[in-house]
Amino acid sequence: MTRSMSLLLMLASLCAGASLAAAQEADADFDMFEEEFAEESVTISDPLRGLNRIMFNLNDKVYFSIIKPVAQKYKQVTPRAARISMRNFFHNLAAPGRFANCVLQGKGKGANTEFKRFMVNSTVGILGFADPATEKMGLEATREDLGQTLATYGFGNGFYIVWPVFGPSTLRDSIGRAGDILTNPLVYVNRSDAFLTLALAKSANEYSFRLGDYEALKMDTLDPYVVMRDAYIQFRNQQISE
Protein backbone atom coordinates (compact mmCIF):
# COMPACT_ATOMS: atom_id res chain seq x y z
CA MET A 1 0.00 0.00 0.00
CA THR A 2 1.35 3.45 -0.87
CA ARG A 3 2.30 5.95 1.79
CA SER A 4 -0.31 8.38 0.45
CA MET A 5 -3.01 5.81 1.11
CA SER A 6 -1.53 5.14 4.53
CA LEU A 7 -1.60 8.85 5.25
CA LEU A 8 -5.28 8.99 4.36
CA LEU A 9 -5.96 6.10 6.73
CA MET A 10 -3.94 7.80 9.42
CA LEU A 11 -5.86 11.01 8.89
CA ALA A 12 -9.11 9.12 9.20
CA SER A 13 -7.87 7.49 12.38
CA LEU A 14 -6.75 10.74 13.94
CA CYS A 15 -9.92 12.54 12.90
CA ALA A 16 -12.34 9.84 13.98
CA GLY A 17 -12.33 11.16 17.53
CA ALA A 18 -11.76 14.74 16.56
CA SER A 19 -15.10 15.02 14.83
CA LEU A 20 -16.85 14.52 18.15
CA ALA A 21 -14.13 14.80 20.77
CA ALA A 22 -10.48 14.37 21.55
CA ALA A 23 -9.63 10.74 22.09
CA GLN A 24 -9.25 10.56 25.83
CA GLU A 25 -12.43 12.49 26.63
CA ALA A 26 -14.62 10.76 24.05
CA ASP A 27 -17.12 9.14 26.41
CA ALA A 28 -17.56 12.17 28.66
CA ASP A 29 -17.74 14.51 25.69
CA PHE A 30 -20.51 12.49 24.08
CA ASP A 31 -22.68 12.87 27.19
CA MET A 32 -22.08 16.61 27.16
CA PHE A 33 -22.70 16.58 23.40
CA GLU A 34 -26.26 15.28 23.96
CA GLU A 35 -27.04 17.55 26.92
CA GLU A 36 -25.84 20.71 25.20
CA PHE A 37 -27.61 19.85 21.97
CA ALA A 38 -30.92 19.59 23.79
CA GLU A 39 -30.59 23.08 25.25
CA GLU A 40 -30.26 25.35 22.21
CA SER A 41 -30.44 25.42 18.46
CA VAL A 42 -27.58 26.24 16.13
CA THR A 43 -27.21 27.58 12.61
CA ILE A 44 -24.65 26.64 9.99
CA SER A 45 -24.22 27.29 6.28
CA ASP A 46 -24.85 24.04 4.42
CA PRO A 47 -24.65 24.79 0.67
CA LEU A 48 -23.33 21.27 -0.02
CA ARG A 49 -26.31 19.60 1.62
CA GLY A 50 -27.02 17.25 -1.29
CA LEU A 51 -23.45 16.00 -1.48
CA ASN A 52 -23.14 15.97 2.30
CA ARG A 53 -26.16 13.69 2.61
CA ILE A 54 -24.62 11.28 0.12
CA MET A 55 -21.40 11.24 2.14
CA PHE A 56 -23.34 10.83 5.39
CA ASN A 57 -25.17 7.79 4.01
CA LEU A 58 -21.88 6.37 2.71
CA ASN A 59 -20.23 6.81 6.11
CA ASP A 60 -23.25 5.21 7.75
CA LYS A 61 -22.83 2.10 5.61
CA VAL A 62 -19.06 2.00 6.19
CA TYR A 63 -19.61 2.24 9.93
CA PHE A 64 -22.09 -0.62 10.16
CA SER A 65 -20.43 -2.88 7.59
CA ILE A 66 -16.75 -2.39 8.44
CA ILE A 67 -15.87 -0.14 11.36
CA LYS A 68 -18.32 -1.47 13.93
CA PRO A 69 -17.66 -5.19 13.29
CA VAL A 70 -13.89 -4.65 13.44
CA ALA A 71 -14.17 -2.58 16.63
CA GLN A 72 -16.43 -5.19 18.23
CA LYS A 73 -14.01 -8.00 17.43
CA TYR A 74 -11.07 -5.95 18.65
CA LYS A 75 -12.90 -5.23 21.90
CA GLN A 76 -13.65 -8.92 22.40
CA VAL A 77 -10.03 -10.03 22.08
CA THR A 78 -8.29 -7.09 23.76
CA PRO A 79 -8.49 -6.60 27.54
CA ARG A 80 -9.85 -3.24 28.63
CA ALA A 81 -6.64 -2.43 30.52
CA ALA A 82 -4.64 -2.90 27.32
CA ARG A 83 -7.05 -0.73 25.35
CA ILE A 84 -6.82 2.02 27.95
CA SER A 85 -3.02 1.89 27.81
CA MET A 86 -3.13 2.11 24.03
CA ARG A 87 -5.49 5.08 24.19
CA ASN A 88 -3.18 6.79 26.70
CA PHE A 89 -0.20 6.23 24.39
CA PHE A 90 -1.82 7.82 21.35
CA HIS A 91 -3.28 10.65 23.42
CA ASN A 92 0.17 11.42 24.81
CA LEU A 93 1.61 11.61 21.29
CA ALA A 94 -0.85 14.39 20.50
CA ALA A 95 0.28 16.48 23.49
CA PRO A 96 2.72 18.67 21.48
CA GLY A 97 -0.15 19.75 19.25
CA ARG A 98 -2.35 20.62 22.21
CA PHE A 99 0.54 22.50 23.80
CA ALA A 100 1.13 24.53 20.62
CA ASN A 101 -2.54 25.44 20.33
CA CYS A 102 -2.67 26.52 23.97
CA VAL A 103 0.28 28.82 23.29
CA LEU A 104 -1.31 30.21 20.13
CA GLN A 105 -4.53 30.89 22.03
CA GLY A 106 -2.69 32.60 24.87
CA LYS A 107 -3.74 29.94 27.38
CA GLY A 108 -0.63 29.83 29.52
CA LYS A 109 -2.13 27.58 32.17
CA GLY A 110 -3.20 25.05 29.57
CA ALA A 111 0.21 25.13 27.90
CA ASN A 112 1.92 24.57 31.24
CA THR A 113 -0.41 21.66 31.98
CA GLU A 114 0.22 20.01 28.62
CA PHE A 115 3.98 20.41 28.99
CA LYS A 116 3.96 18.83 32.46
CA ARG A 117 1.65 16.05 31.32
CA PHE A 118 3.85 15.17 28.38
CA MET A 119 7.03 15.10 30.46
CA VAL A 120 5.50 13.04 33.27
CA ASN A 121 3.59 10.59 31.10
CA SER A 122 6.48 10.10 28.67
CA THR A 123 8.84 9.18 31.52
CA VAL A 124 7.04 7.95 34.63
CA GLY A 125 4.14 6.83 32.45
CA ILE A 126 6.44 4.73 30.25
CA LEU A 127 6.07 6.47 26.87
CA GLY A 128 2.53 7.48 27.74
CA PHE A 129 1.04 4.02 28.18
CA ALA A 130 0.12 5.08 31.72
CA ASP A 131 -1.35 8.43 32.75
CA PRO A 132 0.12 9.34 36.15
CA ALA A 133 -0.27 13.03 35.28
CA THR A 134 -4.03 12.62 35.63
CA GLU A 135 -4.22 9.80 38.13
CA LYS A 136 -1.52 10.97 40.56
CA MET A 137 -1.14 14.69 39.93
CA GLY A 138 -4.64 15.72 38.88
CA LEU A 139 -3.41 17.33 35.65
CA GLU A 140 -6.34 17.03 33.26
CA ALA A 141 -5.57 17.29 29.55
CA THR A 142 -6.84 20.24 27.55
CA ARG A 143 -8.91 19.75 24.40
CA GLU A 144 -7.36 22.44 22.23
CA ASP A 145 -6.89 21.98 18.48
CA LEU A 146 -6.06 24.18 15.51
CA GLY A 147 -9.70 24.59 14.54
CA GLN A 148 -10.34 26.23 17.91
CA THR A 149 -7.20 28.32 17.54
CA LEU A 150 -8.36 29.62 14.17
CA ALA A 151 -11.71 30.49 15.75
CA THR A 152 -10.00 32.60 18.42
CA TYR A 153 -8.36 34.56 15.61
CA GLY A 154 -11.71 35.36 14.07
CA PHE A 155 -12.16 32.56 11.54
CA GLY A 156 -15.80 31.51 11.34
CA ASN A 157 -17.07 28.00 10.70
CA GLY A 158 -17.42 28.55 6.98
CA PHE A 159 -19.68 25.95 5.41
CA TYR A 160 -20.51 22.51 6.77
CA ILE A 161 -19.00 19.51 5.03
CA VAL A 162 -19.14 15.74 5.54
CA TRP A 163 -15.96 13.99 4.47
CA PRO A 164 -15.91 10.35 3.36
CA VAL A 165 -14.84 8.27 6.39
CA PHE A 166 -13.61 11.36 8.26
CA GLY A 167 -17.16 12.47 9.06
CA PRO A 168 -18.62 15.89 9.96
CA SER A 169 -16.54 19.04 9.77
CA THR A 170 -16.53 22.64 8.61
CA LEU A 171 -14.22 24.52 6.27
CA ARG A 172 -12.33 25.95 9.24
CA ASP A 173 -12.11 22.65 11.09
CA SER A 174 -10.96 20.84 7.95
CA ILE A 175 -8.03 23.24 7.66
CA GLY A 176 -7.41 22.88 11.37
CA ARG A 177 -7.38 19.09 11.24
CA ALA A 178 -4.80 19.12 8.47
CA GLY A 179 -2.57 21.28 10.66
CA ASP A 180 -3.13 19.09 13.71
CA ILE A 181 -2.02 16.04 11.75
CA LEU A 182 1.34 17.66 11.05
CA THR A 183 2.04 18.01 14.78
CA ASN A 184 1.45 14.30 15.43
CA PRO A 185 4.70 12.27 15.46
CA LEU A 186 2.99 9.26 13.85
CA VAL A 187 2.84 11.11 10.55
CA TYR A 188 6.62 11.02 10.39
CA VAL A 189 6.99 7.25 10.70
CA ASN A 190 9.05 6.36 7.61
CA ARG A 191 8.03 2.74 7.07
CA SER A 192 4.61 2.52 5.44
CA ASP A 193 3.79 -0.85 6.99
CA ALA A 194 4.53 0.40 10.50
CA PHE A 195 2.69 3.64 9.78
CA LEU A 196 -0.40 1.79 8.57
CA THR A 197 -0.33 -0.66 11.48
CA LEU A 198 -0.25 2.19 13.99
CA ALA A 199 -3.02 4.04 12.16
CA LEU A 200 -5.33 1.04 12.10
CA ALA A 201 -4.51 0.15 15.71
CA LYS A 202 -5.38 3.65 16.87
CA SER A 203 -8.62 3.68 14.92
CA ALA A 204 -9.80 0.25 16.10
CA ASN A 205 -8.83 1.02 19.68
CA GLU A 206 -10.65 4.35 19.75
CA TYR A 207 -13.82 2.98 18.20
CA SER A 208 -13.84 0.13 20.75
CA PHE A 209 -14.63 2.74 23.42
CA ARG A 210 -17.28 4.46 21.29
CA LEU A 211 -19.49 1.56 20.27
CA GLY A 212 -23.10 2.64 20.65
CA ASP A 213 -22.47 6.39 20.60
CA TYR A 214 -23.39 6.81 16.94
CA GLU A 215 -26.41 4.55 17.31
CA ALA A 216 -27.61 6.58 20.30
CA LEU A 217 -27.32 9.81 18.33
CA LYS A 218 -29.40 8.33 15.50
CA MET A 219 -32.05 6.83 17.75
CA ASP A 220 -35.61 8.15 17.53
CA THR A 221 -34.86 10.83 14.95
CA LEU A 222 -36.49 11.30 11.58
CA ASP A 223 -33.44 12.97 10.06
CA PRO A 224 -30.14 11.77 11.57
CA TYR A 225 -28.18 13.91 9.10
CA VAL A 226 -29.59 17.12 10.59
CA VAL A 227 -29.16 15.84 14.14
CA MET A 228 -25.51 14.97 13.51
CA ARG A 229 -24.82 18.27 11.76
CA ASP A 230 -26.39 20.46 14.44
CA ALA A 231 -24.92 18.45 17.30
CA TYR A 232 -21.44 18.64 15.78
CA ILE A 233 -21.63 22.41 15.30
CA GLN A 234 -22.96 22.99 18.80
CA PHE A 235 -20.32 20.74 20.29
CA ARG A 236 -17.55 22.63 18.50
CA ASN A 237 -19.02 25.98 19.54
CA GLN A 238 -19.03 24.79 23.13
CA GLN A 239 -15.38 23.71 22.90
CA ILE A 240 -14.36 27.07 21.43
CA SER A 241 -16.16 29.00 24.17
CA GLU A 242 -14.29 27.20 26.96
Label the model's feature ranges.
Residues S192-D193:
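C-terminal transmembrane beta-barrel domains of outer membrane proteins
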